[in-house]
């Protein structure tokens, strides 16, 4: 690691060496990089302009998971509409014996996160009473990295 005011060598490994981010880093143009990243985040409704809640659903049978995830997303969309994205399989769709799907909620900062969290939890609690979802595990991640 190179510390401030120290000379050093930094190696960047990338699939696309002509990507605008790599160019800005090579040019030491961090101010421009920051401005562009912030503009992109605003345009695509990401933090710090929006809050994110990620729900990861897990089950040993992909069919149960698929059905349950779609039912939960449908229930969430009734209240939250287009703020609900998914469900879709995670980048790694299966870990050990569990299949994974995720639902992402993109929420305006002006919304009461307390009320949203209460709504999400009550929706999950009602959904968990159905036969198709009783054995599906749900992990909730507020402001995922």
PLM region descriptions:
Residues 2-145:
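Accessory helical-bundle/CTD segments and flexible terminal tails appended to RecA-like ATPase motors
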């Amino acid at each position: 690691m190179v510390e401030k005011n120290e000379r050093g060598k930094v190696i960047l490994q990338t699939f696309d060496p002509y990507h605008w981010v790599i160019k800005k880093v090579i040019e030491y143009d961090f101010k421009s990089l920051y401005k562009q990243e912030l503009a992109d985040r605003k345009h695509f409704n990401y933090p710090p302009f929006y809050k994110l809640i990620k729900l990861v659903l897990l089950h040993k049978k992909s069919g149960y998971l698929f059905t349950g995830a779609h039912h939960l997303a449908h229930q969430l969309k009734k209240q939250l509409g287009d703020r609900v994205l998914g469900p879709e399989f995670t980048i790694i769709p299966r870990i050990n014996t569990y299949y994974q799907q995720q639902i992402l909620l993109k929420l305006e900062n002006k919304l009461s996160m307390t009320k949203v969290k209460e709504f999400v939890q009550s929706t999950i609690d009602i959904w968990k009473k159905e036969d198709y979802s009783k054995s599906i595990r749900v992990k909730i991640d507020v402001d995922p990295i």
